[in-house]
Amino acid sequence: MSLRRPSKEQPENFEFSTASLTAAKTIVTKYPKDKQQSAVMALLYIAQKQNNNWIPLAAMKYIGKFLDMPYIKVYEVATFYTMYNLAPVGKHFIQVCTTTPCMIRGAYKLVEACKEKISENENELSKDKSCSWMEVECLGACVNAPMMQINDNYYEDLDKEKTLKILDKILSGETPKPGSYRGRINNEPENTRKTLMDLKNA
């Protein structure tokens, strides 16, 4: 794993919004009183959602106090897991899976589309500052490869042309429909084969 460093530019303060605070308290109460520090990952996610898709150091310190947990322990969690962004990303944060199943099915064509429409390099903001992209490891939708995640939504069964159209919509302020772009429902077969024993259509 590459070394992950927090952004050099950091806000001085952070605190949960009313909605985030309610969500955090709800999660913490699900743990025994002596195990509530186990909620740290969920609270980091809440902080990231509130703060435009990235977690500043001030948020880590705030969560440490919230959970009565040493700041360094929160920092260790946030810097270890790659789903936590340690520097500003776009409002539309695009993650392209390039693990083996997606790679075999053309994931790097999706990367080409991101380079053309957003920025030449990963983790760079688009010209209008609204989007950024990066390659990631498996997102768990291998059967619908290649795919990418935009914020909380999955876009599956893609190729370069379809990806370019999705990115054009995002850049123009539209919200593209998530899901399969081959018309599949969830992960149903692409042909008429419905069982492993249906050898005629294999």
Segment roles from a protein language model:
Residues 1-202:
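Signature of N-terminal electron-transfer/Fe-S-associated modules in redox systems
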